[in-house]
């Protein structure tokens, strides 16, 4: 058995022996380490491993970013029980009550945030991107170098905000047909009440409808394609959670393994996308009338490839184009599906609300066909959507930003560069100063507000403002909110005109959970009952 003194002596002897070979420092120490390990006893090996882990832990602690608490920012009020059963809403409410005029620290999955009170919403939204960047935050929090999260070119953002928004109305009828195909795949046409696992069905419908618009109906109805897009959020989220509990120094060693499934999925998506985009590029380059080619069409998919090519102006890398499409397909799914899930839950719990929206649809559709507009005519449906987003938002926190320069806000100390900040949205959505009975779902709340002449263009689902925090705000607000608005209305229209939906007997609306970073988690296992209105009517007629 070798003692520590003998180890040091052995190291010096071997080092002296290898001196004539002129090995590098790394090569010499690698050979010595292998030799010492081979000659050591079991006890000595355990001791070496223990010392190594201790040194690694100390180094990791010394090199990790310093906590914001050193600036005097207090920590969030934490419950006594495990964070695995964390009631984040209570954490936020208790912390806001204790620190009404101060930011507080929150650490979730290895990322530390300074959570600012809701009264700071307008101040934070005005911070320019070069000072406080949303994309920089998401790149860091979701390991963008490995996952592609938070990677969006300015050209893509402008294309979504301008050309896509302009092209939505002309495709309404075609998207209704895309939606019908999606429902046929995911729900079927049950003549009797059928249990449907709601979140999975909604997610697949959203993926299919959006994919048909971006890459064509052939891929949008391809089961393998749907599975790949469906898996991406899980393959991003689960490794992110694991890395949050991993020592900082070990994370680079684990990332290649943890994100391997996501990277494999992205490679498969790219291989399926490549022929579609190559066709688009050839069509764009061969066209002599690009203005006509890129104008809104009433059939097929949107001209996303052509719009991007016109903005990149010949400097496009095909891999960048592929990544742009993956970004669009990924970012257009989770928040839209979550919002739609909660709206359907409200409808399932209230048959009278379903009938009211069906009556509105009868007034604004022609044999089931919606007008080729942005669908602002559907005011009651819009109100239900906005109220659902208020009562069941995508996250309790909004305006996530990473500071690139030291920043002094109206409250709290100066925050150093590299600080992650966000704003408490929960106390906007539940503010009694903004909303009457804020803890009650009122589907027509915003419809009634818009009856006032001065509110004609306010209180819409896709509007920005300090009373509608879900989209973010300012120049870094979600550029695809009009597309999401259109998608949800088309899907709800098909559902209401073709299906009845209700909760299972004796059940109430599915409960919501929350992650330690404030994200609201729908009950992904919840089941509701669907029945085809046409099939059930036929059966009733036969009786």
Curated annotation (Swiss-Prot):
GO terms under biological process: secondary metabolic process
Gene: CYP1
GO CC, alphabetical: membrane
CDD domains: CYP503A1-like
Function in brief: Cytochrome P450 monooxygenase; part of the gene cluster that mediates the biosynthesis of a tyrosine-derived cytochalasan acting as a fungal signal recognized by resistant rice plants and leads to avirulence in Pi33 resistant rice cultivars. The first step in the pathway is catalyzed by the hybrid PKS-NRPS ACE1, assisted by the enoyl reductase RAP1, that are responsible for fusion of the tyrosine precursor and the polyketide backbone.
Keyword presence, Oxidoreductase: yes
Family: Belongs to the cytochrome P450 family.
Keywords: Glycoprotein, Heme, Iron, Membrane, Metal-binding, Monooxygenase, Oxidoreductase, Transmembrane, Transmembrane helix
Organism in which the protein naturally occurs: Pyricularia oryzae (strain 70-15 / ATCC MYA-4617 / FGSC 8958) (Rice blast fungus)
EC number of this enzyme: 1.-.-.-
Binding site for heme: 478
Subcellular location per the Swiss-Prot or TrEMBL entry: Membrane
Known glycosylation sites: 210, 367, 517
Protein name as it appears in the record: Cytochrome P450 monooxygenase CYP1
Induction line: Expressed exclusively during fungal penetration of host leaves, the time point at which plant defense reactions are triggered.
GO molecular function: heme binding; iron ion binding; monooxygenase activity; oxidoreductase activity, acting on paired donors, with incorporation or reduction of molecular oxygen
Residues passing through the membrane, by range: 40-60
Metabolic or biological pathway: Secondary metabolite biosynthesis
Cofactor(s) needed by this chain: heme
EC class: oxidoreductase
